[in-house]
């Protein structure tokens, strides 16, 4: 069973789960957080279990404003705040007696797959990273998945919300996804997103809320990993993409991978799958989890084996 933990990030209490292998350590640790509107119970325990089997501890946390963590407005995604939460989670991990602070890895999926790249590029404490089906350029992502007409509607909603926030201070909300995405303004206009997250909420992540602030989408359109990739000079980097992923756009992901200069990098394509299958199909999830576990074992465990 994981251990409940908490630490402070920018004045708010962030809560998480610590998973650890048998024994006293010190162990390498993988710092983990989720994608869009994730909570720590959603999918991530399966990945954490794989990393523990590989000999690593794992720290999974809820971002500020989500799940069990403090912070307002609720369900508001600021990627730079989330990246700061990652770095504060690393600082917390360094204080743990069971952790070897010289063997810290980061892992992310979907939106946080991009965060893992940026954290790895900007925090020298990160010695290894895994980026799974990442968001790499938010504006391009939103324009492509919504199409020209849909993106006009989304842009109008963002501008109207900004004016309302200026006048009243109140944040507006839209669904993360919806079966009625053709007529309703949503963030991710895919029916399989609605179905998969409803099932995950019912079976393993009751804290998940399937909505986000409209300002979160504006933040997404100003988010890109590309300026940071050139700074990943020597950090072992694994990127896992889903063949044909049209949600976070596998062609853009591969373009980002090709711009990472380190020679210690690997691209793994999960064949015959989709973005959401890596959430909902345990056999496909296991493929991605085991690839990440092998990567962390290769770079954080085996070189230090006595």
Segments and roles (model prediction):
Residues 50-70:
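Conserved alpha/beta-hydrolase
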Residues 26-35:
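Short beta-strand element of the alpha/beta-hydrolase
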Residues 246-252:
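Conserved alpha/beta-hydrolase "acid-adjacent" motif
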Residues 117-197:
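Alpha/beta-hydrolase-fold enzymes
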Residues 1-25, 279:
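N-terminal cap/lid segment of alpha/beta-hydrolase-fold proteins
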